Amino acid sequence: GTRGNVQPYIALGKGLQSAGHTIRLVSHSNFESLVASYGLEFWSFGNDVKDAVENSDMQALTEKGNFLLLLAKMAKEAQREALRFAEGGLLAAQGMEIVLSGLGGLFIGIAIAEKLDIPLVQAYVVPFSPTREMSSVLTPKLPPVLNRVSHQLTRQLMWQGFRSADTIARKKVLNIPAAPLLGPYDSKSIHNMPILYGFSPSVIPAPSDWNDQTHITGFWFVDEADDWQPPAALLDFLQAGPAPIYIGFGSMSSRAPEQTADLIIQ
């Protein structure tokens, strides 16, 4: 994904490295210098994600917030790159004892873990585990009775969109059976393995119906160098008046920009 998708996993990788583990971070080639700057071993899928992210069609869909069309576009891109992702991921995982995957790499991560007969830890920055206590991040607020269904639908939308690419990777590179029709969510590679969430329980409290293997760990932030000095123009701006408040959302679009603005003002 974009830097916002990758940097939390750099922080997580640094934490695991500090605990004595050997880490390989696998992503798109344009993140090599960023990952290496934090002292982590980098393995590339071989392509530059900017080619897809900066595509005019992709940008237009992102701005509109139409998830279904955006998912279809991403699925088509994944199908085109399926062999490259599988080959790069399989090479990187050689000799490793575990695969850790975020949402974007979940399906290929599970397939590689199955191929190598090693476990996979799911590590997300948004809620993905079904619960009755909140709706999916891709749906509006719903009656509690529909919340769990919204998560299941989201999981199926993601899987069915990427199923073709996953099947190609499993057949042509990994030489393993295709995943079940409804997805690899019951794969032995993730059975009884932890699920990690990189956000604060003060922001999203842990639902009471999540199991004991699901952990909200707090945000995954990298330790920046403490010798950084802001540019003079920025210092002048900050000292010219009351302390400003900055609220940003990176590359995310909003389906209700006016409501979002009202919420920020409140």
Residue ranges and their predicted role:
Residues H28-P244, S251, A256-D262:
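Nucleotide-sugar-dependent glycosyltransferase catalytic domains
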